[in-house]
Swiss-Prot record:
This is Bifunctional enzyme Fae/Hps. In the N-terminal section; belongs to the formaldehyde-activating enzyme family. One of its GO terms (biological process) is L-ascorbic acid catabolic process. InterPro entries: Aldolase_TIM, Fae/Hps, HCHO-activating_enzyme, HCHO-activating_enzyme_sf, HPS/KGPDC, OMPdeCOase_dom, Ribosomal_Su5_D2-typ_SF, RibuloseP-bd_barrel. The active site is at H17 (proton donor). It comes from Methanoculleus marisnigri (strain ATCC 35101 / DSM 1498 / JR1).
Length: 393
């Protein structure tokens, strides 16, 4: 047996985080248990979990401090409320039947425990660590999470300590606001007035990047830390280099021109895979987007069907979106761009578009928030998990 459990409970300085492994005494966990208790480390000395002095819990449990214990008060916290909480959680779990079918005498547990150096409240330290230990134990024995739960939750997740959410494009449709601007004050106004919405993407347009460079991404990120940000470089050469530059700047996606050589596009895609950002292929002036996608050995994340600003008086034509999706695979998203107005939103959606790219209809509006909200309403989107009350799950 080799089981792994994890849990985070509480908030503030007393927040508790438990990582544990559980296994047989004769196995890898038992060996690690013996090594830890016999090979002490300064500031991280492991201690047996005891309900009170002279009453260790079963299964035998070793507590390992994650944070270096430098001060006397930290040692007192670890040998006081933390030790009692972990031991009581294990003992109560036996009483509650959590260990049903487990040989208690042949099992050992190692629990790595986090206590922040500024934690003070003994009551909270005890209660949070008690809850975290019980939850981590149950999760380990339940083999939590299963793969289905992991895949369902991974893009909904916001790390409690990190403080911001990294957006991914898993729940179309989306509204992408293209900031084809050359004025920083105008950009800031747009960023401040756009609504906070899970289905809104922010694009640093080509003119904006040409005027201020990729460093403008950091300014956008400062104002909209949770946004999905696209850098519209329209790359024609050095695809891997410009993809890496975009990732380093903090953007979530880079736009490569569909007119670029196939090798350039493929190198860009390969580098975005390495850095964890999206590749958008802009098909502006590309006669046969389907053929381009078919030629690619590695497929992009998004294909953008794009009419240029200079030809926006021509009729709307989205091309064969189903054929593009077939060529690009089931995960491919298709965006439509160029003079998008509210009156064509539903037509674009019916044609199969996942992302609608809107520029001046929003950025040049006197009421930017209202204009964006009207487009979002046309898309009939709902905030992700808006009505979900989150605890741990």
């Amino acid at each position: 047996m080799y089981l792994i459990g994890e849990a985070l409970v509480g908030d503030g300085a007393e927040l508790a985080h438990i990582d544990l492994i559980m296994g047989n005494k004769e196995g890898a966990v038992g060996q690690a248990f013996a090594n830890s208790i016999s090979q002490l480390s300064k500031g991280h000395t492991p201690l047996l979990a005891v309900v009170r002095p002279n009453l260790p819990t079963k299964p035998s449990t070793l507590i390992i401090p994650k944070v270096t214990l430098k001060k006397e008060y930290q040692v007192n916290q670890m040998f006081g409320p933390v030790q009692a909480a972990v031991a009581k959680a294990v003992a109560d779990s036996i009483e509650e039947g959590v260990f049903e079918g487990v040989d208690i005498e042949d099992t050992v547990i190692m629990a790595s425990v986090f206590v922040h150096p500024t934690a003070q409240d003994y009551n909270k330290i005890y209660r949070f660590n008690y809850g975290a230990m019980k939850l981590a134990l149950r999760r380990a024995l339940d083999r939590f999470p299963d793969v289905e739960t992991l895949l369902h939750e991974k893009d909904r997740a916001a790390h409690a300590v990190m403080g911001f959410k990294v957006q991914r494009l898993w729940d179309p449709p989306y509204l992408q606001v293209a900031m084809d601007l050359v004025d920083r004050n105008h950009m800031n106004r747009v960023l401040d007035e756009l609504p906070q919405n899970d289905h809104l993407i922010i694009e640093a347009g080509t003119p904006l990047i040409k005027k201020f460079g990729l460093s403008i991404i950091s300014e956008i990120r400062e104002r909209r830390p949770n946004a999905f940000i696209v850098a519209d470089l329209k790359t024609l050469d050095t695809g891997n280099l410009e993809a890496r530059m975009t990732a380093d700047a903090g953007a979530d996606a880079v736009v490569i021109s569909g007119l670029a050589p196939i090798s350039t596009i493929e190198k860009a895609i390969e580098d975005t895979r390495k850095t964890g950002i999206y590749t958008v292929i802009d098909m502006l002036n590309v006669k046969d987007p389907v053929a381009v996608v078919k030629q690619l050995k590695v497929k992009p994340d998004v294909v953008e069907l794009h009419r240029g600003i200079d030809v926006e008086d021509t009729a709307y034509a989205w091309g064969d979106i189903p054929a593009i999706k077939k060529a690009g695979g089931e995960r491919l998203l298709v965006a439509t761009a160029g003079g998008i107005r509210q009156g064509v939103v539903k037509d674009a959606r019916k044609a199969g578009a996942d992302i609608l790219v809107v520029g001046r209809a929003i950025t040049a509006s006197k009421n930017i928030q209202h204009a964006a909200e009207e487009f979002l309403e046309e898309l009939s989107t709902e905030e992700i998990d808006q009505f979900r009350i989150m605890t741990d799950f």
